[in-house]
Amino acid sequence: PYGAAKLYAYWITKNYREAYDSFACNGILFNHESSRRGETFVTKKITRWCGENLSLLRERKFQLIEPLRLGNMDAYRDWGHARDYVKSQWLILQQDEPDDYVVATGETHTVREFVKKCFDWMGMPLEWSGTGIDEVGVHAGNIVVKVDKKYFRPSEVDVLLGNPSK
């Protein structure tokens, strides 16, 4: 439904632009993140968990920590920052002629890479072991990240990569 609605919006915008000579542009925005991201999105879930557990991790109170549970660690996403995407939207509207644009970084990173970056930033490197639903992230001999099949999407898209050339 989400993709179908996006496709409908794309074509109705294009149709109005051509039929009524409207200044109407499509901005096709790939994943963009900020502190305002919804709590159920994976990036927010990861950063929130890290923030909530940082002091316990530093104090090595692992028994008080419930592991971070995630779905597909091999999902590749083209993640950018919302502030950059808002600037891109403004620039799209400054063009002399209306057109359609892709707003993306042009590179992908896995969920696993995102988790690793967060833990590295906290000064707590992870070691990974296992594969698939048996994969875990371990810090100081303690499991702090677990893959949980309940977080796998029923129709997961393996790779989302945008071409920002226009």
Language-model features: locations:
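C-terminal substrate-binding subdomain of Rossmann-fold SDR/epimerase-dehydratase oxidoreductases
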Residues: 37-166
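Active-site Tyr-X1-5-Lys
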Residues: 1-25, 47-56
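Proline-glycine-enriched beta-turn/loop adjacent to the NAD(P) cofactor-binding site
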Residues: 28-33
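Short glycine/serine/threonine-enriched helix-capping/active-site loop
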Residues: 25-27, 103
